[in-house]
Amino acid sequence: MRRVSMRSLKRYLKAIWDLLRLEHGLMYGFGVVIGIYVSDPFFSDLWKLLLGYLTAVFLQASTFALNDYFDYEVDLVNNRTDRPLVRGDLSRRIALALAIALMPPGFVAAYLISPLAFIFAFAVSVLACLYDYKLKELGFAGNVYIAFTMAAPFLFGSIISSGWITEKTALLASMAFLTGVGREIMKGIEDVEGDALRDVRSLARTMGERKAASIASLFYLTAVSISPIPLFLLPEFLFDLKYAVPVSVTDVLLIYVALRLVGDYERESIRKYRKVTLVAMVLGLVGFFAGAF
């Protein structure tokens, strides 16, 4: 009996983790830390750093729970067994309750940092709710929003440490944004059947999967094209191997995906390529963080 109970508890906790996508929250929090130190390598207020990290984790978890609440029927059609609601491990009511409960702590943490930090966090969260409810159906506009959320942690970090968005952070955010748009267009290809249920106007549905894949490739190549800029224009990164080496690997991975997408945009391939781009983004974060010191 005890063994069964422990197994049930582990399954429940895993379902909560999967619903909230806490691995993404940890990465978003790390993005805030990177934004802080890319903007100001000598930042020393650990209390604000912790608050910034918690803001990202709480708000990200809340919006992912809300996303699964609204996307339940689409995820069923797409057979998204990685989603706990589809597996039956959690109810939609629990997902909605968690979405509502986790947002206020994120706002409180942001408010304790500064008024500007609170305004930024609140605005991003409002957009997140609109996206989960309706913006997603607008297709490319929704892709742009999600890509912005990938860049937002760096901008938020810069606001925490410098009170504004620095050039260094803006470049980092731009690369994250461009890569994020590519990833979201690919997700539209992967989810094209389920998106028909909500009449999501993704590029894959409005222009065809082949053209959508080509556009995603273009965004990846654009991200690669701006990655050398810090090496030549920002004094802190001038010919810095700590930045150049990991970012070069990032570029190679993104170029690989961009070239493969032109002729291979099957569902299974898209899933694999999205994982490759996630690795590329993590390496890019490492490069910017290392180059800041």
Curated annotation (Swiss-Prot):
What family is it from?
Belongs to the UbiA prenyltransferase family. DGGGP synthase subfamily.
Which pathway does it serve? Membrane lipid metabolism; glycerophospholipid metabolism
Q: Which reaction does it catalyse?
A: sn-3-O-(geranylgeranyl)glycerol 1-phosphate + (2E,6E,10E)-geranylgeranyl diphosphate = 2,3-bis-O-(geranylgeranyl)-sn-glycerol 1-phosphate + diphosphate
Q: Does the keyword Phosphoprotein apply?
A: no
Q: Which UniProt keywords apply?
A: Cell membrane, Lipid biosynthesis, Lipid metabolism, Magnesium, Membrane, Phospholipid biosynthesis, Phospholipid metabolism, Transferase, Transmembrane, Transmembrane helix
- Say which species the protein is native to: Archaeoglobus fulgidus (strain ATCC 49558 / DSM 4304 / JCM 9628 / NBRC 100126 / VC-16)
Q: Name the enzyme group at the top EC level.
A: transferase
Presence of keyword Transmembrane: yes
Give a Gene Ontology cellular component term annotated to this protein. Answer: plasma membrane
Q: What is its main location?
A: membrane
Q: Which superkingdom heads the taxonomic lineage of this protein's source?
A: Archaea
Gene3D superfamilies named among the record's database cross-references: UbiA prenyltransferase
What CDD domains would the database entry show? PT_UbiA_DGGGPS
Protein name from the UniProt record? Digeranylgeranylglyceryl phosphate synthase
One Gene Ontology term from the biological process aspect of the record: glycerophospholipid biosynthetic process
